[in-house]
Amino acid sequence: MTQVAKKILVTCALPYANGSIHLGHMLEHIQADVWVRYQRMRGHEVNFICADDAHGTPIMLKAQQLGITPEQMIGEMSQEHQTDFAGFNISYDNYHSTHSEENRQLSELIYSRLKENGFIKNRTISQLYDPEKGMFLPDRFVKGTCPKCKSPDQYGDNCEVCGATYSPTELIEPKSVVSGATPVMRDSEHFFFDLPSFSEMLQAWTRSGALQEQVANKMQEWFESGLQQWDISRDAPYFGFEIPNAPGKYFYVWLDAPIGYMGSFKNLCDKRGDSVSFDEYWKKDSTAELYHFIGKDIVYFHSLFWPAMLEGSNFRKPTNLFVHGYVTVNGAKMSKSRGTFIKASTWLNHFDADSLRYYYTAKLSSRIDDIDLNLEDFVQRVNADIVNKVVNLASRNAGFINKRFDGVLASELADPQLYKTFTDAAEVIGEAWESREFGKAVREIMALADLANRYVDEQAPWVVAKQEGRDADLQAICSMGINLFRVLMTYLKPVLPKLTERAEAFLNTELTWDGIQQPLLGHKVNPFKALYNRIDMKQVEALVEASKEEVKAAAAPVTGPLADDPIQETITFDDFAKVDLRVALIENAEFVEGSDKLLRLTLDLGGEKRNVFSGIRSAYPDPQALIGRHTIMVANLAPRKMRFGISEGMVMAAGPGGKDIFLLSPDAGAKPGHQVK
């Protein structure tokens, strides 16, 4: 089916320029690259861009620690990031930086338009100030107790337990992450973006189909709780762009970071000497399509602030946000101590890029689900699918064609109906690539690979080759197998760029989507060379060990949980005695509708029942498994009203968060209501 060529601009979230690219980052860049490569195969005009997010307090402070300038640090990180992405064959048309003249000009332009249109408000605020470092503390540089659910060790912008958002000044017992000092309050004039003015527009945009259902539902929660004005300024010292006519005030990193998409595209247009395309893609009534691939952790900024900023400054809004989940390794959060926090560069020292591209692709869908990289399953799947099913199909047939027929394929198809079955699948597979149902596309392709190998097994060319007078049959069978291999590799071309190059060299032709409608007949192929090597668990073991060694080399004197979560200040025995810890029996456990973090627990204290909301859902995806288990709870914690009901206590758990949360249990014999002493 002939498609009308579209103009498409695709972006990935901008990696922060203070650390290396790891396998968590690579999920998004691989997902976007597969989609982009498919769009290009279908004849669409695609501009695929990215940049480093190069501003903010963390970069300023890390550069100070390294004894270099922020500019030097972000320059080195940019080179490292680009090398990693090139190693994974991410086909960016441009990779830039938010610390660029294009981004400065666009940030100032958008800010000036927002101000002219009345969407920038000035007001004096009280904020936390580190007296030891002599600096105001951004929200992520303050930790304390959540003012909503009272969970300790939460950042100054949102609680990872209950999901509440708040200002750093609302934290209970705040501490500076920079120095550990107790902050003091100081007044400062700040600039705010009037986000509530865009509530009606954002709600209409949410319902327009521009967002996945899960994202739209989450946005509805934010609308119900009310949108707040957004502080877009930061005080010196700060590494970023100074706000025009406001000495000592800088744009908050999240203002100029998404503008970095525009800055990178502007840089690309300038490199091409193209003064038209930028406006063509970004003007208010643009007919070009704009897609952002992002992780679920930055949905808030991309689904609320970014479209509102664009609307208020007379630019177009995104066509769609494509949101994905996190990466776990072997069923758990990536861990430096276990060697599963794997950098992109470390991976490439042990495996090729196509292997990870294939594994991620086989697991991805259009939903916001986390992806688990199970390293044993990875080895089995790559060997079973790429080596045994696809590459082996070519190797089983190529030898006979090269040796017996001088590399020339038969002039007719041995089984036209089977070939039609393969080409007819283009519509289903293409739709799966288009809709980002990548796992479905891979399943369809592997089902075809099974059919192709079954055909070869049934025709047994190795037997035919020994029978006199059957040369024509042998050529026809092997040519059929090679033609089926060609179709499979065409469907896999968006996923496996390096294997595709080797396949095209063997087939002596470029693989194109429409080209499969015409089989290779009477065509000369090149001598067959090994296309792909099997992988084994020894490589995995070496990869994990190398990742551990990298951590050891970079480790500070303090390692383990205490490094990230130091012991709190000493308290008196009288303070501790105020906490009444009791054994409780979990009578019921269930999901909380409207929350992806909480479970509702019904607890028996041996004489009364308690209803407790606990942020442990990520570690206990099957709440029924908790029923009948004993745990420890804080029984005298004041009840707190939540959106879902009243929580009458807190259960005790350990761990860094995510899937690594471990509910505490007493020894056998403890009864509900027993006091923990």
UniProtKB/Swiss-Prot annotation:
A biological process term (GO) from this entry: methionyl-tRNA aminoacylation
SUPFAM superfamilies: Anticodon-binding domain of a subclass of class I aminoacyl-tRNA synthetases (SSF47323), Methionyl-tRNA synthetase (MetRS), Zn-domain (SSF57770), Nucleic acid-binding proteins (SSF50249), Nucleotidylyl transferase (SSF52374)
Known EC number: 6.1.1.10
Positions bound to Zn(2+): 146, 149, 159, 162
Cellular component, GO, one term: cytosol
Motif 'KMSKS' region in this chain: 333-337
Catalytic reaction(s) noted: tRNA(Met) + L-methionine + ATP = L-methionyl-tRNA(Met) + AMP + diphosphate
Family affiliation: Belongs to the class-I aminoacyl-tRNA synthetase family. MetG type 1 subfamily.
UniProt xrefs under PANTHER family: METHIONINE--TRNA LIGASE, METHIONINE--TRNA LIGASE, CYTOPLASMIC
HAMAP family the record matches: Met_tRNA_synth_type1 (MF_00098)
The protein's name in its UniProt record: Methionine--tRNA ligase
